[in-house]
């Protein structure tokens, strides 16, 4: 089963979609600057030397600037105390130039990440992790939505159309970052939603019933071809680095080369990943508009 079995039309090109979204955001930021004399500002806080986090923060910084959004990068040493980090968040909460605050996870082990996230002003919580935003999302109220699930939903609607009502969606993974908010978004679209995770006894059978299959477990190639219903739309959120024949490559949670019978699938890399940063900047633009009571369009 070679990769040639997956027709080009079945590949969901997240890179292309994200580029279009970024073009739209850039144009809106320019218009806002002309009308208000101000631009949205995003503060990103990185604690310690985690190499993957440094790469992510660098990429976010570049793309933020490219969209015309002000980027404030705070790189703190690994030994930063809880009090020091909370004090920085408190300063950013009241800084009028900062409309969105993102704390890059994971934090060093001695820091309480949940306490840090809850310290962020919910109106500046562009990652959508604050309990206020999570609660609003769960009860169907306007909220900042975590960037990865939001990106997944945009890709689904681009492929399936705006109306997802009645489709059976299976979400594999129950993290607060992807799985749980994804379930809430799909419920809001009137999908029938099943959530499965590492303790689920019959995960393959459940997945085989899915019209929409979203996989976010961090286990390379866990979902095999026979887990996928013919014609299903598969969104692979996994980003796993694997070593093979002395080389390192990035793969998803789905055995991509076995998914030729899927109706559509996101590749890894180039699927969900680019959407996450685009949605972060979209949330930052929304935060600016809400804080200044200006129309986003």
From Swiss-Prot:
Q: Write one Pfam family the protein is assigned to.
A: THF_DHG_CYH
User: Record's GO cellular component, any one?
Assistant: cytosol
What Enzyme Commission number(s) apply to this enzyme?
1.5.1.5, 3.5.4.9
Supply one GO molecular-function term: methenyltetrahydrofolate cyclohydrolase activity
An example of a Gene Ontology BP annotation on this entry? tetrahydrofolate interconversion
Protein name stated in the entry: Bifunctional protein FolD 2
User: Record's Gene3D superfamilies?
Assistant: Leucine Dehydrogenase, chain A, domain 1, NAD(P)-binding Rossmann-like Domain
Report the protein's function: Catalyzes the oxidation of 5,10-methylenetetrahydrofolate to 5,10-methenyltetrahydrofolate and then the hydrolysis of 5,10-methenyltetrahydrofolate to 10-formyltetrahydrofolate.
| Catalytic activity line of the entry | (6R)-5,10-methylene-5,6,7,8-tetrahydrofolate + NADP(+) = (6R)-5,10-methenyltetrahydrofolate + NADPH; (6R)-5,10-methenyltetrahydrofolate + H2O = (6R)-10-formyltetrahydrofolate + H(+)
- Summarize subunit and interaction data from the UniProt record for this chain: Homodimer.
Q: What keywords would UniProt list here?
A: Amino-acid biosynthesis, Histidine biosynthesis, Hydrolase, Methionine biosynthesis, Multifunctional enzyme, NADP, One-carbon metabolism, Oxidoreductase, Purine biosynthesis
Biological source species:
Sinorhizobium medicae (strain WSM419)
């Amino acid at each position: 089963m070679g990769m040639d079995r997956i027709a080009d039309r079945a590949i969901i090109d997240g890179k292309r979609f994200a580029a279009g979204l970024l073009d739209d955001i850039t144009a809106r930021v320019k218009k806002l600057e002309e009308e208000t004399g101000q631009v949205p500002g995003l503060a990103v806080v990185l604690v310690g030397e985690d190499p993957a986090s440094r790469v992510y923060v660098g990429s976010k910084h570049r793309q933020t600037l490219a969209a015309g959004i002000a980027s404030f990068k705070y790189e703190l040493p690994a030994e930063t105390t809880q009090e020091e980090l909370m004090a920085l968040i408190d300063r950013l909460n009241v800084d009028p130039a900062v409309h969105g605050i993102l704390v890059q996870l994971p934090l060093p082990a001695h820091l309480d990440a949940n306490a840090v996230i809850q310290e962020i002003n919910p109106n500046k919580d562009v990652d959508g992790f604050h309990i206020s935003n999570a609660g609003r999302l769960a009860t169907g109220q306007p909220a900042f939505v975590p960037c990865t699930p939001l990106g997944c939903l945009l890709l689904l609607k681009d492929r399936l159309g705006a109306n997802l009502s009645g489709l059976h969606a299976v979400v594999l993974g129950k993290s607060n970052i992807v799985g749980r908010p994804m379930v809430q978004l799909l419920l809001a679209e009137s999908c029938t939603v099943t959530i499965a995770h590492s303790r689920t006894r019959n995960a393959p059978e459940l997945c085989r019933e899915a019209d929409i299959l979203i996989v976010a477990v961090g286990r390379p190639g866990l979902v095999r071809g026979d887990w996928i219903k013919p014609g299903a739309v598969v969104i692979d959120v996994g980003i796993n680095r694997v070593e093979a024949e002395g080389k390192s490559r990035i793969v998803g949670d789905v055995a991509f080369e076995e998914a030729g019978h899927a109706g559509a699938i996101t590749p890894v890399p180039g699927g969900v990943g680019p959407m996450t940063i685009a949605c972060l900047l979209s949330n930052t633009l929304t935060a600016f508009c809400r804080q200044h009571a200006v129309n986003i369009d």
